[in-house]
Amino acid sequence: MSLLHTFWRLPVAVFFEPHEENVLRCPERVLRRLLEDAAVTMRGGGWREDVLMDRVRKRYLRQELRDLGHRVQTYCEDLEGRVSEAEALLNQQCELDEGPSPRTLLQPPCRPRSSSPGTGVAGASAVPHGLYSRHDAITGPAAAPSDVVAPSDAVAASAAAGASSTWLAQCAERPLPGNVPSYFGITQNDPFIRFHTDFRGEVVNTMFENASTWTFSFGIWYYRLKRGLYTQPRWKRVYHLAQMDNFSISQELLLGVVNALENVTVYPTYDCVLSDLEAAACLLAAYGHALWEGRDPPDSVATVLGELPQLLPRLADDVSREIAAWEGPVAAGNNYYAYRDSPDLRYYMPLSGGRHYHPGTFDRHVLVRLFHKRGVIQHLPGYGTITEELVQERLSGQVRDDVLSLWSRRLLVGKLGRDVPVFVHEQQYLRSGLTCLAGLLLLWKVTNADSVFAPRTGKFTLADLLGSDAVAGGGLPGGRAGGEEEGYGGRHGRVRNFEFLVRYYIGPWYARDPAVTLSQLFPGLALLAVTESVRSGWDPSRREDSAGGGDGGGAVLMQLSKSNPVADYMFAQSSKQYGDLRRLEVHDALLFHYEHGLGRLLSVTLPRHRVSTLGSSLFNVNDIYELLYFLVLGFLPSVAVL
């Protein structure tokens, strides 16, 4: 056959379009598919079906990827539009009128100021070693003469700038919020402590930097933790553990423990919208609604926190009367603040039944019984309806208002809008609020048991933390003696250590960080509660053992292991061998110990004595002055010369 014959005379069936050079044109992908079909046909069996299924999956996968890309593009465009709208609204709100407000006149205009090295604010060099007097902490640091601007000068400067000036433009030269120092007061006879971003981290750094020829010990509990970690090479290297013959603790180990204690009540889930402190404020506001009659009711969580010194004594008296009239069984160890969890409960967050715990979980909790009687909590899903309330509703023909939901919406609408959770249905918030209330009650009972101006038995002073030069320049030398501040002293039998903490520590911290939790405020309280729970032999994985032999026949519950839930959580945080669920389970076990320990400490007749025993035997705490610092810091150093 001649090569010049045209293609249609070839004895070949034509499947592809002809080419001018008499060559069949076939795409590469088609040839690859033909080869695959031939190989599958030759092999036989189930290969052909597998190849066909792979092709179907690839086709659907391409379609799903295209749909996903389209949805992502649409979402990004929508987000960009919303950001633009918010930016426009902010620009409109920040524009100033021609006549400045009186509040603006009182504020000097922002000027670039020279900052001292390591301070971040002007004039900080006049305050030695991060301490400040109480008067200056409240009224603000004294400005230099060149920085003081009269109100008339401020008006003139504002008028010269023109009506188009904005608040953003005026404050563009202010230091960042993270660099602005804050002031916390712990005891009445010590100056305020100034910090910038991390309160306890900066205290620990200052403490170890000032130590040159001495070191610190923090009690037997910390030494046992060091001894347990020393035998494991990895943790020995991570926490810089050395010198097992003394009680000194490395800075890395101390920061690791404090970080674990701060996160006890911080629940690591994306859908947790409330802190335990905010949940407790909602419960307290609903409980003390009679207190607001004749005065302006609180409209924010910060206002309720300011009323803690008035609300907690009333709550403590009602709890005492409720315990005295208690009917029915009590939890193991006479714990009136216990939760009757199911034996297989591993996670704190209820995952089934519409975020409801097992029926009967709150039956033996004294605060729940009290709130039921006061009408704060009317009905919990899974519990029987109160007959008296049901009869009143039938007779009156109307349902009573849910007091807790009303106050929750009033306090949280500014933060959450319309998505305020209902505590009786999302019961993790109810449980965290009850636990936080128990912690606040314990704080009030313990801190107001004695005055810081009484004769001391301990040797710790603030100079041990920050140096004697810093304390001497801060207002009250030595950190031991000083005049009583008006309204907070121990005269006439009134001890107001807790009131001082609320005003100068809890309130400022919440104003700085509204998401703060009780364990972040008082890691020492969390450590005491966890230690009490571990010493009792209670184990969250063996709840049925605790429920069976706690308070009957004088049975003693033995501790089966020398576990340390704080150390376990430290390992889970820094180890790659733990998955997310396992890490969450370890955190929740620590949280369960914290709840159980708080209940045990509050259920004894004199909580102050039990706390004092724990503090003196394990944490170097000997008096109320040292206890206040331990509760706030989570540790109490004792100086040891090298």
Curated annotation (Swiss-Prot):
> Where in or outside the cell?
Virion; Host nucleus
Instruction: Give one Pfam family, short name only.
Output: Herpes_UL25
The entry's cellular-component GO terms read: host cell; host cell nucleus; viral capsid
The answer, when asked if Ubl conjugation is one of the entry's keywords, is: no
- In this chain, the stretch annotated as Interaction with major capsid protein/MCP covers 1-48
Q: What is its main location?
A: virion
Which keywords appear in this protein's UniProt record, sorted alphabetically? Capsid protein, Host nucleus, Host-virus interaction, Viral genome packaging, Viral penetration into host nucleus, Viral release from host cell, Virion, Virus entry into host cell
What are the BP-aspect GO terms?
A: symbiont entry into host cell; viral DNA genome packaging; viral penetration into host nucleus
Region ranges (Disordered): 97-125
Described by its record, this protein's role is as follows: Capsid vertex-specific component that plays a role during viral DNA encapsidation, assuring correct genome cleavage and presumably stabilizing capsids that contain full-length viral genomes. Participates in the interaction between the capsid and the tegument through interaction with the large tegument protein/LTP.
Subunit info here reads: Heterodimerizes with CVC1. Interacts with major capsid protein/MCP and triplex capsid protein 1/TRX1 at the pentamer vertices. Interacts with the large tegument protein/LTP.
Q: Which family does it belong to?
A: Belongs to the herpesviridae CVC2 protein family.
- The entry's protein name is Capsid vertex component 2
Upper classification of the source organism reads: Viruses, Duplodnaviria, Heunggongvirae, Peploviricota, Herviviricetes
